[in-house]
């Protein structure tokens, strides 16, 4: 239904809508690193597709306002799937969705943050889903708290990703993966901040 639903809703509600909500999670159940890391290209295509739909409805209605995007939920999520299937139904405060992230996950989160910055002209809000314990960059236990690998790209983007995003043109070798073509080996974004 992707595309049809967004277009239909905007066609009916364009004058009442300021933001279109997006959600997306990525996993690596197939243990396919090249394809997993290429998911940032899938996120880029997803954003571009929704922007095109918003702009098509705007053109059809001769609208003046530009609908922006709110990427309400995004993250890497797959490590805990098998463990969560074994949980007792209706248990009290079960430990669930507690993914323990690796370096591949940090690379993809970093690339997804780059993708969000590159689309800052239209993606005005983006929320990493969740922040503590549940598919999260920070984990806690009775004995303390620790930062996972995905914490660091998020932290550095928060520090250095403030300002005006510049149009960056990068020429680098590309590869094809199981689901994506022409994936660049180099992903980058520049942010100017006085």
Question: Over which residues does each language-model region extend?
Answer:
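Alpha-helical scaffolding within the catalytic cores
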Residues: 2-12, 111, 182-186
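Aromatic- and acid-rich polysaccharide-binding/catalytic face
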Residues: 6-44, 67-68, 72-77, 87-98, ...
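Aromatic/hydrophobic pocket-lining residues that form the small-molecule binding cavity
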Residues: 43-47, 109
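Carboxylate/His-rich catalytic cores and anion/metal-binding grooves
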Residues: 54
